Regions:
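Glycine-rich phosphate/pyrophosphate-binding loop shared by adenosine-nucleotide-utilizing enzymes
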Residues: 1, 56-60, 148
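A short beta-loop-alpha structural element at the N-terminal edge
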Residues: 1-14
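Conserved GNAT-fold acetyl-CoA-binding loop/helix
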Residues: 15-41
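Acetyl-CoA-dependent GNAT
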Residues: 31-85, 96-97, 156-158
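Conserved catalytic-core motifs of GNAT/GCN5-like acyltransferases
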Residues: 62-65, 114-115, 127, 132-149
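Conserved beta-strand-loop-alpha-helix junction that forms the acyl-donor binding cleft
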Residues: 87, 113-123
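Conserved GNAT acetyl-CoA-binding A-motif
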Residues: 103-115
Length: 162
């Protein structure tokens, strides 16, 4: 497996993997994968990566700004998605580890993740990479008519902003 920077030509695979995550009902409140323009404007240009296996994109990770306020320029939110046929192979852990390194190279001091409590594998990957549970955002939004909680996790860099 190879972790590399995202290229625009990866977007078809990235969008498909994103939709697979959406379809689980435990990855995001989104109902449909974003098109190129919306996806491209949602994520920081410098922190977008993919996992490639046998020339196939099997996962992706990217950061989005946590806020548009200047004081929070060093705070970003993690998005990470793995193709359903490649779950439980360590791809998510590899992507998150590389994303952390890239984020620190970009001067980002805090990473945040909002995770459905039912998404145990995502919670485990984030915990393994130094994220701590800050709290639960109760009934943050409705999905299919039911209120959903979000586990709020955060990782503070040990090298940036110390």
């Amino acid at each position: 497996m190879k972790i590399r920077n995202f290229k625009k030509s990866d977007f078809t695979s990235v969008k498909s993997i994103y939709q697979q995550g959406i379809d689980t009902g435990n990855a995001t409140f989104q109902k449909k994968a974003k098109g190129w323009s919306e996806w491209n404007s949602s994520f920081l240009i410098t922190c977008r990566i993919v996992a490639e296996l046998n020339n196939e994109v099997v996962g992706w990770a990217a950061l989005s700004a946590a806020s548009n306020r200047t004081v929070y320029n060093g705070v970003a939110e993690v998005s990470i998605y793995i193709a359903k046929n490649y779950a439980n192979y360590g791809i998510g852990n590899s992507l998150l580890s590389e994303l952390i390194s890239k984020s620190e190279n970009e001067g980002i001091w805090t990473l945040q993740a909002g995770i459905f409590p039912e998404n145990e594998s995502s919670i485990a990957i984030h915990s393994k990479n130094g994220f701590k549970t800050i709290g639960v955002r109760e009934k943050l939004g409705k999905m299919n008519g039911a209120w959903r909680d979000i586990l709020f996790m955060e990782r503070r860099s040990k090298v940036v902003g110390i």
